[in-house]
């Protein structure tokens, strides 16, 4: 479920964009249509909200319909070419280029009521790296402000003979992430990173996401299947030309067919970690 970004390039291929769109729709459905789990009063006229790793700003655009037009919405991402054009943004939305590993503008420090981020921390190379990235995000909140983070865990899936394609997909994905210094399991590490960063009043939810035939309904079955297939296609591009250790083109072709069939007939599951808390006042 994590962000799949090739460390050699910050641009995104169309299948990766499709994956992010599907991911947003699926997670919104899993959350019962909610965009935030933190107990934030979205009716406040002076709200300042940051969405880090905003991509196409899907989350912010949905949020814009729920908050007053006087609220200030900011989105950041390493790939600004994916931002919606100004004509498709509300006047109270600002989008700008920013990596979570680069220093943040001093004017942004301590200025947000809510900092939100989904599926970005896989890019951290170690627990220390993750804790530091979370601490930098927390520093953007006002004293008493909220931080809400969402991450996945690619390591924990259903295994066994009936899940051979999903297991092979998992193994290829984990190897690809590790090869570019990313961690495949930021979800289980999330609360430790947040606690070490100084987050207080923390709450964590771990949800099981049914994939394909194991999904709660047909729409989520279709979204989750396409999400997995788009991840596989992104990993295929990441590993192209990377030597004998990378799967062959034929293996990717065969695996995509097998993975689709297995998900549609048997299904699988992922664990989804959501945690929120506050900056100490």
From Swiss-Prot:
Paired cysteines (S-S) = none
**Keyword Transmembrane recorded:** no
Molecular function GO labels: methyltransferase activity
Enzyme Commission number(s): 2.1.1.-
Q: Which GO terms describe its biological process?
A: methylation
Recorded superkingdom: Eukaryota
Pathway involvement of the protein, from the record:
Secondary metabolite biosynthesis
Q: Its induction, per UniProt? A: Expression is positively regulated by the thioclapurine cluster-specific transcription factor tcpZ.
Q: Does the keyword Oxidoreductase apply?
A: no
Query: Per UniProt, which keywords does this protein have?
Result: Methyltransferase, S-adenosyl-L-methionine, Transferase
According to its UniProt record, which protein family does this protein belong to? Belongs to the methyltransferase superfamily. LaeA methyltransferase family.
Role summary = N-methyltransferase; part of the gene cluster that mediates the biosynthesis of an unusual class of epipolythiodioxopiperazines (ETPs) lacking the reactive thiol group important for toxicity. Firstly, L-tyrosine is prenylated by tcpD, before undergoing condensation with L-glycine in a reaction catalyzed by the NRPS tcpP leading to the diketopiperazine (DKP) backbone. Afterwards the alpha-carbon of tyrosine is oxidized by the cytochrome P450 tcpC to form a hydroxyl group.
The protein's name = N-methyltransferase tcpN
Please give the organism.
Answer: Claviceps purpurea (strain 20.1) (Ergot fungus)
Lineage of the organism: Eukaryota, Fungi, Dikarya, Ascomycota, Pezizomycotina
């Amino acid at each position: 479920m994590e962000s799949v970004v090739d460390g050699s390039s910050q641009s995104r291929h169309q299948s990766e964009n499709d994956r992010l769109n599907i991911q947003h729709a699926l997670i919104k459905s899993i959350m019962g249509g909610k965009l935030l789990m933190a107990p934030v009063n979205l009716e406040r006229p002076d709200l300042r909200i940051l969405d880090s790793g905003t991509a196409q700003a899907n989350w912010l655009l949905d949020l814009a319909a729920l908050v007053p037009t006087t609220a200030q919405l900011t989105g950041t991402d390493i790939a600004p070419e994916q931002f919606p054009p100004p004509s498709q943004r509300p006047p109270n939305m600002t989008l700008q280029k920013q990596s979570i590993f680069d220093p943040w503008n001093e004017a942004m420090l301590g200025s947000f009521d809510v900092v939100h981020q989904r599926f970005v921390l896989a890019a951290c190379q170690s627990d220390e790296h993750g804790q530091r990235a979370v601490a930098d995000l927390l520093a953007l909140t006002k004293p008493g402000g909220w931080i809400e983070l969402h991450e996945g865990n690619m390591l924990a899936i259903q295994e066994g003979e009936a899940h051979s394609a999903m297991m092979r997909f998992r193994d290829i994905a984990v190897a690809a992430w590790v090869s570019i210094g990313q961690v495949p399991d930021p979800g289980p590490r999330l609360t430790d990173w947040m606690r070490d960063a100084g987050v207080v009043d923390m709450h964590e939810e771990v949800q099981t996401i049914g994939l394909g035939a194991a999904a709660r309904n047909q729409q989520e079955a279709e979204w989750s299947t396409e999400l997995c297939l788009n991840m596989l296609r992104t990993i295929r591009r990441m590993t192209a030309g990377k030597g004998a250790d990378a799967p062959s083109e034929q293996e990717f072709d065969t695996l995509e067919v097998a993975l689709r069939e297995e998900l549609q007939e048997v299904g699988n599951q992922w664990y989804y970690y959501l945690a929120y808390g506050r900056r100490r006042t």
